[in-house]
Structure formats: structure tokens, C-alpha cells
Amino acid sequence: MIKVVICGAFGRMGTIIGEIISKEQDMQLVGGVDIKEGTFFGVPVVTSDKLADFLSSVQPDVVIDFTVAPAAAQNVPVAARAGCAIILGTTGLTQEQRKGIDAAIREGKVPAVISTNYSIGMNILWTLIRDAARKLSDYDVEVIEAHHRYKKDAPSGTARTILQILQEEIGPREEIYGREGMTERSSEIGVHVIRGGDIVGDHAVMFASNFETVTLSHRAYDRSVFAEGAVRATRWVFGKEPGIYGMKDVLNLS
């Protein structure tokens, strides 16, 4: 039985993940963490300042974090010191926060899966984008992403991963965020961010030449697609050797 604590228990993702785990035969939800205390699918939820003592009490195997960057930067080191495997889906981390998280995972000698998107489809799309970028390196490239009005980080973590892939394959290129006025295109990557309504997540990469346009895209219709991926990663990371993994490891993608 895999015992799980969810940080961000009352959030959109935390609630969906909690519901899924509560129905799994090989998993047990033992607690949650959020900015207010309460109960969550019949288990206690504590505030992050009590996390260390709480983990010592409930002894989870895996801690899942879908919070906000400042909270994750505090939660993950505490979980690593407690010897818990980690699933991190929080986006918007600064380089300094990510370095601190990575160091804590290594010092704690625990396994962790870190991804900006737990959708199986998006992880496959990332591999396709990398392959396309290698073969279409002289094409103009644009990245477009859209999310709900409440999303705090822009561009999204998923879009940042796309940009990282593109820079690795065809960079370095300047990233231009939106355009205004008379602007002649140079060697760059255009980035366009849309926020509105309750858009779950749309991402597209356009490769354009004078003769054709190739567009690779992914649309999530329900947040459950991310939650299911996170639960899959939870099952995978349990018992793994210490180290920092990605969803490509979970899905055995090259």
C-alpha cells in the first residue's frame, strides 16, 4: 500500500488527485497540506508550518505537491528530509527555488518526479517538438499557449518546457513575448500567452517557412488528465532509487 500526502489539498489539482487516490486499491490517502486546516476525503489537512511533524506522524511513502512556487520551495525540502518520495507538479519556480529543491532531493537521497505537465499526451508532444525542431531548424517558430484566467504564471510551465526544448535544439534565439507595431522578424521565437475563462490548457508550436506551416498542438479538456498522470507517476516512483526523474522516465520515452 502506497501512503500519500497531498500538498495543495484544497486546490483544483489537489482535489482531483485526492479523489482518484481515495479510490485506488494500492494507495492510501493519509493527509493533506494547505493554507488552512480541515479534512479532505476523510483525512486531516494541516498547514505547511506543521508539515514536518505531520509527516513524522502519518509516515507517507510519497508526497505530491501541486501548490504555488513559494510553498513548494518550502514543502519539498521538508518532505525530502522526512525520506518521502516526491511528485512535484508546481510551476512558476525561479531558478533559485528549483536549485534549492534539487539540492534538497539529493541531500535527502529520495526519488522524485518533477514535471511541468503530467499529461501523457503532452509528454509525447514534447518528444515530437524536439524531433521537429531538429529537422526544421531553419523555419520560423512561434509558441502559443492559453489557460484559465486564474493561472498565476505566464508563460505556463509547459510552455517554458517547450521553449527549453526549442532553445536546446535550434537556439540560442531571442524569445519575443508578443508583438506591437511594425516589427520585422529576425531569428527569434515568438511567444504568445492567452488567459481567459476556464481554459484547461492549450499549447501549440508553429514551424513556418515560405512554403508550408507545420503545427504541433495539444489541448487538455479536463484537469483529470494531469491528475491521472500524477497518480501514475506516484505508483512509478514508489520504491525507486534516489534521483530526480521526469515523466519521460515514467512513460519510458526516449
Curated annotation (Swiss-Prot):
List of catalytic residues: 147, 151
Key word Cytoplasm present: yes
Pathway(s) of this molecule: Amino-acid biosynthesis; L-lysine biosynthesis via DAP pathway; (S)-tetrahydrodipicolinate from L-aspartate: step 4/4
Enzyme Commission no: 1.17.1.8
InterPro entries attached to this UniProt entry: DapB_C (IPR022663), DapB_N (IPR000846), DapB_N_CS (IPR022664), DHDPR_bac (IPR023940), NAD(P)-bd_dom_sf (IPR036291)
Molecular function via GO: 4-hydroxy-tetrahydrodipicolinate reductase; NAD binding; NADP binding; oxidoreductase activity, acting on CH or CH2 groups, NAD or NADP as acceptor
Binding site for NAD(+): 8-13, 89-91, 115-118
Cellular component annotations (GO), alphabetically ordered: cytoplasm
UniProt-annotated location(s): Cytoplasm
Top-rank EC class of the record's enzyme: oxidoreductase
Keywords: Amino-acid biosynthesis, Cytoplasm, Diaminopimelate biosynthesis, Lysine biosynthesis, NAD, NADP, Oxidoreductase
Binding locations of NADP(+): 36
GO BP: any one term: diaminopimelate biosynthetic process
PANTHER family membership: 4-HYDROXY-TETRAHYDRODIPICOLINATE REDUCTASE 1, CHLOROPLASTIC-RELATED, DIHYDRODIPICOLINATE REDUCTASE
Protein's job: Catalyzes the conversion of 4-hydroxy-tetrahydrodipicolinate (HTPA) to tetrahydrodipicolinate.
Family: Belongs to the DapB family.
Protein name per its UniProtKB record: 4-hydroxy-tetrahydrodipicolinate reductase
Species this chain originates from: Methanospirillum hungatei JF-1 (strain ATCC 27890 / DSM 864 / NBRC 100397 / JF-1)
